[in-house]
């Protein structure tokens, strides 16, 4: 895959990948999972994680697109982001429009976009009747990425649940931060591999958002099990937070019995992170990570050559920015700040 993209670097690529074959260095996990045609078709699949604010209809469909491609998603439902969503404008109940869902990642993502646009926007639209007939049955082989298809049922349930949230609103109302969060969690519920959930999420919210702070209290796992799809973390701006506020929030975390919300300290409320909180990310940016296995390091020189190999592979990965489906801002941001992460694993061995 890399040699095909960078033929002039063939010799160095082969040399550095000997470290991978010897288990001394690891490229991004997604590049190991989807190397070849999957990444050539959708370069975003080389990246482990991404971050975006939920501030437009496209944010919902892009989240579905990224999760189905194997990328973990950090997202912001901070008040100043969710407020940018247009008010609810319910579709005409007596005017119907059929939408045939394509049997692809893009097709599933488009179904979310069409649903959200039918409820959010300036113009009142027809009600959407979704046609799932083109989606391959459960257990069918996925030719490009491998594995087996989940069938249409997870997407059907996702659309029904999201529609339920939207129908509970009245025209002119805005989605709340918690409702926006729940919609993203319903999207994650639809992302399955072998019948098992495979979506990773972290939801960042405003520190004074009481609904989000308490969304995992009580028997939430029975009444709102979708909320288990995401870690929820309050964004605390370092130069604004007070000890009293922090301790009050900490007490609420203890009382929740769930260990949440988490606390995400930041200097800028526009920056987010990936679900593992390994790195600060700009809005619409990907996390590019390689790892060095340090469990059997023999010398400083040994460590140096491994880090050099990992940095080289990370640089190759950073060049995969010819995204499709995603808005242009994704490519602009990822190229402007081409992250090259090199971490260490095996320190405790």
Task: Give the label of every model feature segment.
Residues 1-349:
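Extended catalytic cores of very large enzyme megasubunits
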């Amino acid at each position: 895959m890399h040699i095909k993209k960078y033929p002039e670097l063939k010799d160095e690529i082969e040399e550095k990948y000997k470290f991978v074959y010897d288990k001394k260095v690891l490229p991004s996990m997604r590049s190991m999972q989807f190397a070849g045609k999957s990444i050539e078709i959708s370069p975003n699949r080389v990246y482990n994680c991404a971050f975006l604010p939920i501030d437009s209809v496209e944010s919902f469909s892009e989240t579905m697109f990224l999760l189905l491609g194997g990328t973990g998603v950090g997202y912001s439902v901070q008040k100043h982001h969710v407020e940018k969503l247009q008010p609810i404008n319910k579709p005409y109940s007596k005017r119907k429009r059929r939408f045939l869902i394509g049997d692809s990642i893009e097709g599933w993502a488009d179904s979310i976009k069409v649903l959200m646009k039918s409820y959010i926007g300036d113009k009142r639209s027809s009600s959407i009747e979704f046609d799932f007939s083109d989606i391959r049955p459960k257990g069918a082989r996925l030719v490009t990425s491998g594995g087996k298809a989940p069938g249409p049922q997870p997407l059907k349930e996702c659309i029904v649940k999201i529609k339920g949230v939207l129908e509970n609103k009245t025209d002119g109302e805005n989605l709340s931060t918690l409702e926006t969060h729940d919609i993203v969690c319903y999207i994650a519920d639809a992302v399955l591999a072998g019948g098992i959930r495979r979506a990773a999420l972290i939801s960042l919210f405003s520190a004074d958002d009481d609904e989000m702070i308490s969304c995992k209290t009580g028997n939430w796992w029975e009444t709102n099990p979708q909320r288990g799809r995401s870690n929820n973390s309050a964004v605390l701006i370092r130069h604004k937070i007070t000890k009293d506020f922090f301790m009050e929030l900490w007490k609420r975390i203890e009382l929740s019995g769930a260990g949440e919300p988490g606390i995400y300290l930041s200097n800028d409320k526009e920056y987010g992170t990936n679900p593992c909180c390994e790195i600060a990310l700009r809005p619409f940016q990907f996390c590019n990570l390689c790892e060095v296995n340090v469990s059997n390091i023999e010398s400083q020189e040994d460590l140096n050559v491994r880090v050099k190999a990992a940095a080289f592979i990370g640089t190759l990965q950073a060049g995969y920015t010819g995204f499709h489906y995603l808005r242009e801002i994704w490519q602009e941001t990822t190229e402007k700040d081409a992250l090259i992460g090199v971490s260490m694993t095996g320190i405790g061995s």
